[in-house]
Amino acid sequence: MVNKMKWRRTHYSADIKPEMDGQEVIIMGWVHSIRALGKIIFVILRDREGTVQIVAPKQKVGDELFSQIKKLGAEDVIAVKGKVIANEKAPNGFEILPLELEVINTAKRPLPLDPAEKVPAELDTRLENRFLDLRRPKVQAIFKIRSEMLKSVRNTLYNEGFIEVNTPKLVASCTEGGTELFPISYFEREAFLGQSPQLYKQMLMATGLDRVFEIAPIFRAEEHNTRRHLNEATSIDIEMAFADDKDAMDILEKVVYNAFVDVYENRKKEIETLGIEFELPPEKFDRITYDEAIDIANAKGVEISWGEDLSREAEKAIGEEMEGLYFITDWPSEIRPFYTMPDEKNPNICKAFDLMYKDLEISSGAQRIHLYDLLVENIKKKGLNPDGFTYYLEAFKYGMPPHAGWGLGADRFTMVLTQQENIRECVLFPRDRQRLTP
C-alpha cells in the first residue's frame, strides 16, 4: 500500500485498442477477479469505463512481479504499467502484459457485497453497502445515463433561452399550503426544508429574467413507502414569462424528447449493459383531457368521479390504454394548487397538466395566476391565509406578466430512461421513510 501514487493513469480501459499493440500504458482500478493457472495469472482490472485483462506468465514477468500479482485479492486498488498485446482470443482483442505493479490499497475480506455480481444481493443489502454496489457495471450504467439526461436537459433549456438559478431550500413556511414539511431549528425560529421552488420561480417572473430553470433537491415529509416515492428527490423546474400552459408543454416535450435522443446516441454501451430495449418516443406526445382520462378509467372498471384525483388503480388503467408518454390536461381547479390559472370559460377547470409515462407521473405543470386579486381570492378558496404568503404576493403588485412552468422529477425520469421498477435504483443514496443512512 502507498501513501502517494508514483504514476498517473494514461488510459481508461475503454481507451485501449488492439491497434496499440506494443504501446506502454498505465491503467488504474480495482481487481475485479483473479485466476491463477499454474505459472500464468489472469487479472481482470475494472475501472469506470469497463474491464481489461492483464495476463502475467511467470517466465515473462519474472518471479518477483509474479509473486506480487499472486497476492492480489478482489477489490484491491492497483496501478499497472504494462504493454498492450494484441490477441484476437482476448476480451476486446487485446490484453496487458504487466511490467510493474503498484498496490495502492487493499480491500478487507470477506466483502459485504460482491461487485462482480457472482453472488446476488437484496436491494436493502446493496443500499447499505452502496459504495460497493456502485462499483457494479449495471449500477454505474444507471447513473451515467442519469448524468447524460441532466446534461441534455441543461443544454436544451440553455438553447431555449433559459437561465439557471438557485432558490432557497430553507424556508419560513410551506410552498403550496400543504403540511408535508420537514421542520428544522433555525436559530430562535422554526424553519422548514423546501418542498418546491414554486413560489420563488414565480417571483422571478416579475424580475424580467423571463425564463429560468433549476435542478435541485426537494423535501417532502410524505409517509409513502412505495417503489416510486422518496422523501428527498431531485426536481427539474422551469418557469417562463409571457407564456401559457401550451407553451410550457411544448418546452417539456423538447426537453424530454431530446434527453431520450441524447441517451440513445451517447450511451449505447450503458443501454447494452442494462440489457434494455431502448425506443425513442415521438417528438410530439399525445394529449388527453382529465375528462377523457377518467372515462378510460371508468371504462376499465375503475370508478373515478369528476373532481377526484386519479387513484393508483386509475393511473394503471389509463397507462394500459395510453402507453408511452402522454399529457393529461384541463384538470379540475379544486384539486390543483392555488396558483393555477382557471380556464376563462369554465373556472371549474384549470390550465394544468401532468406528463405521464404509462402509469407513472413524471412531471406536473400549469399556467399560473399572474393577477394579484385573483391569486388572493384563490388562496382563500383553498382555506389558506394570504398573510402567510406576504413576501410572495408582493411580487404580484408591481407588474407580473403571464407565466407558466413545470417540475420534472429527475429520479422518476431516470426510472423511465433506464427501465427500473424501483426509484431507489436511480438515486445514489436514497432517502425514504426508513433510510437516513448511508
Curated annotation (Swiss-Prot):
Residues 198-201 are annotated as: Aspartate. One of its GO terms (cellular component) is cytosol. It comes from the Archaea. Mg(2+) 3 binds at E361. Its EC number is 6.1.1.23. It is found in: Cytoplasm. L-aspartate binds at E176, R220, S364, R368. It holds the Pfam family tRNA_anti-codon. InterPro entries: Aa-tRNA-synt_II (IPR004364), aa-tRNA-synth_II (IPR006195), aa-tRNA-synth_II/BPL/LPL (IPR045864), Asp-tRNA_synthase_2 (IPR004523), Asp/Asn-tRNA-synth_IIb (IPR002312), NA-bd_OB-fold (IPR012340), NA-bd_OB_tRNA (IPR004365). Its cofactor is Mg(2+). Belongs to the class-II aminoacyl-tRNA synthetase family. Type 2 subfamily. HAMAP family: Asp_tRNA_synth_type2. This is Aspartate--tRNA(Asp/Asn) ligase. It comes from Methanocaldococcus jannaschii (strain ATCC 43067 / DSM 2661 / JAL-1 / JCM 10045 / NBRC 100440). The lineage of its organism: Archaea, Methanobacteriati, Methanobacteriota, Methanomada group, Methanococci.
